[in-house]
């Protein structure tokens, strides 16, 4: 059985090919490469397309569907609209459309929003949106990899999203625009609200550079800013302050959910979260009283493949989210 998992990330589209539950290949296409590349042509370099049994697709915010749904039944790519969600390149749209037009069996994974029934009603009352689809994939990866039923997952990368899983179901959490900062994205504070009101910037522009990058002089675009700041941690005072401040904000976010986390398990993921120099997870652990696990690798794409694989084995529920797909 061969499945493909897709992570629609800020800096690019990552794909994981899995055969009989084992990772066969992982590849990434940077956002800026999509003008000259076809996703399916790249996928053909790794696997015969006719051999694929199912693809697990993550696209944008996923706020237009509330189940893991057969792509043939999804309208408008599973989103309400594409406004206010960060820098738009168009690569994810191209990948989605190529997959749908190919007729390869595929499911679209939703994001976490008010329509997701497994979420605690208080979180849904507080926030219209909690996470994009790949965060569900990352949570499922952690759930399977570490055999955990109760844990906090903090995915730290271009943005930071922190989720709580209780009794094997997604309970709630904080979206990228709410609490902790990522390298690029973060919550909008008073200064940014004033700039928005004065029409100096849009709310989306404010969110897109409200992360740790605002502390530095190191913005290098959506693909290269992370490495620029991390590599300068020991050499540049502003970059060090930016990373240390990110760690503080993530620690605060994790600790704010700990009273709802009965086993004190914490999983750190994301390209920044798994960084070893500086050791981000160790820095966060020093601020937090919990049992720490680090989910290495391309956790979103792998998790999407795990979801597709388990659906083929008859799974009808993924972390509390229903599956709407018929196995032929």
UniProtKB/Swiss-Prot annotation:
Species assigned in the record: Methanococcus vannielii (strain ATCC 35089 / DSM 1224 / JCM 13029 / OCM 148 / SB)
Signal peptide interval: none
NCBIfam families per UniProt: methan_mark_12 (TIGR03281)
Positions in coiled-coil regions: none
Similarity annotation: Belongs to the UPF0285 family.
Protein name according to UniProt: UPF0285 protein Mevan_1551
